Amino acid sequence: SLIELTKMVFQETGKNPVTYYTLYGCNCGVGRRGKPKDATDRCCFVHRCCYKKLTGCDPKKDRYSYSWENKAIVCGEKNPCLKELCECDKAVAICLRKNLGTYDKNYRFTMKFLCDKPEKC
């Protein structure tokens, strides 16, 4: 769910995901789509593509379990869809951490009309 995703992103980046990423670029945040503006925005694009592959669970609402062990996210689900959901969220959290250096304040609060048509997953 969005709860676990928010926690993971904070644990990996140290940033408040609601204020730092919600309207970043063309792909970060619920319902946003467009050609990625930079590597940070691409993390969100790839995350959306990961969600599209899920069948049998709702990425926004379904809760899953994970742990934070030695500064690493460990997905602990037995349900296959929830395990994949956890792995999607883990991947975006790690991607955002690895790309903190590409974060461009000019892409915060990007309006949809400034986004080009998205590429395919």
Swiss-Prot record:
Expressed by the venom gland. The keyword Cytoplasm does not apply. SMART domains: PA2c. PROSITE patterns: PA2_ASP, PA2_HIS. Keywords: Disulfide bond, Myotoxin, Secreted, Toxin. GO terms for cellular component: extracellular region. It is found in: Secreted. The keyword rRNA processing does not apply. It holds the Pfam family Phospholip_A2_1. One of its GO terms (molecular function) is phospholipid binding. One of its GO terms (biological process) is arachidonate secretion. Disulfide bonds join 26-115, 28-44, 43-95, 49-121, 50-88, 57-81, 75-86. Snake venom phospholipase A2 homolog that induces myonecrosis, and edema. Has low myotoxic activity. Homodimer. Belongs to the phospholipase A2 family. Group II subfamily. R49 sub-subfamily. This is Basic phospholipase A2 homolog zhaoermiatoxin. It comes from Protobothrops mangshanensis (Mangshan pitviper).
